[in-house]
Design a protein with these regions (language model features):
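Sec-dependent N-terminal signal peptides
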Residues: 1-14
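N-terminal pre-domain segments of enzymes
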Residues: 16-66
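Forkhead-associated
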Residues: 62, 67-133
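Mid-length scaffold segments of soluble, non-membrane domains
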Residues: 88-90, 95-104, 203-247
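Short strand-coil-strand connectors
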Residues: 116, 137-139, 157, 215-219, ...
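An exposed acidic His-Trp-rich patch
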Residues: 117-130, 220-271
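Surface-exposed beta-loop interaction hotspot
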Residues: 139-204
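Extended, aromatic/histidine-rich regions of cofactor-dependent oxidoreductases associated
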Residues: 241-245, 255-259, 264-266, 270-308
Length: 308
């Protein structure tokens, strides 16, 4: 090898390797959340859901509902009471008096009811029509007055109810990122009310929030949510083809965040849950409105826990 060739060879060996040219930046493709993230989030959500359901005032404690007639009606654990209270409530606990749209309650002597932690000696009761109702408590039993159209009823709960004590959980479909979909909220051209049927046989008028348009397995579907006053979420009452054999027959509930500035809403069907009527025959549940029964099996969220 000549002297010049040797020098060039040594110089090339001593030089650092050339850095590769940077690749042009690629536009990031949209990705679904990893399945394990969806599973963990669903598990955390469901733990909170079960905590609320099994709380001392949860739906598992609902043991009675009596619609009041005009005039006086007795309340107590004695057979023949107009408003039946579970033992260990006194056989004669007091008297309800309905006068038109107002209801009062007079405790019987020795029945130590409380209202907001203070002794209640009698008087008018606030219903659930506009905000939180008055809740009277006596031991493990509590009751409140609810209004449903022209009906006024006494809703009775018992924290020692068998349904609460014997509760063993609710089966879930395996969480899947495929059921966390992005929807587009199409607003109504003008404000309108949605006719929502109920298990009581009449329909309630609820404020429409528009129409959610989304795609599952390449097919477009639509759902109509309702907008509850003061809520930061959309409320959806829907049915699907799993109601026939795997989920609660009357449909399920789903909540979703309000749309972003572009009208996008994330629908996480992994969080679809059973209405109170799946656990007690004394609830007054809304049912899916016309158009909210999907012609697809939504195999996500809670499965059937028992019909009533």
């Amino acid at each position: 090898m000549s002297t010049l060739a040797l020098v060039l060879s040594l110089a090339l060996q001593a030089s650092p390797p050339a850095k590769p040219l940077p690749k042009p930046a690629a536009q990031a493709a949209p990705r679904k959340a990893p399945a394990e993230d969806v599973a963990a989030a669903t598990q955390a959500w469901h733990a909170e859901r079960l905590q609320r359901l099994t709380s001392p005032d949860g739906w598992l404690t609902l043991v009675g509902l009596t619609w009041l007639k005009e005039g006086e009606q007795t309340a107590g654990s004695a057979p023949g009471s107009a408003v039946v209270l579970p033992a260990p409530a006194p056989s004669r606990a007091g008297t309800f008096v309905r006068k038109g749209d107002s209801v009062s309650f007079q405790p019987a002597p020795g029945a130590a009811f409380t209202l907001e932690g203070k002794p209640f000696t009698g008087g008018a009761l606030k219903t659930d029509e506009k905000g939180a109702p008055d809740v009277l408590r006596l031991g493990s039993v509590n009751f409140q007055v609810i209004r449903r159209q022209e009906r006024l009823g006494v809703r009775v709960k018992d924290s020692e109810a068998a349904a609460r004590k014997q509760f063993h959980g609710i089966p879930l479909y395996p969480a899947s990122a495929d059921w966390k979909v992005e929807a587009r909220l199409v607003p109504d051209e003008k404000p309108r009310m949605l006719s929502v049927p109920t298990v009581l046989g009449y329909s309630e008028e609820m404020k429409s929030a528009g129409t959610l348009v989304f795609t599952v397995a390449g097919k477009e579907y639509r759902l109509m949510p309702v907008a509850e006053d003061g809520s930061d979420e959309l409320f959806i009452i829907f049915g699907d083809e799993t109601n026939r054999d795997a989920t609660y027959g009357a449909g399920r509930f789903l909540e979703a965040p309000l749309p972003d500035k572009d009208g996008r809403v994330v629908l996480d069907f992994n969080r679809a849950y059973n209405p109170p009527c799946a656990f007690t025959r004394f609830a007054t549940c809304p049912l899916p409105p016309r158009g909210n029964r999907l012609a697809v099996r939504v195999e996500a969220g809670e499965k059937r826990a028992g019909d009533h």
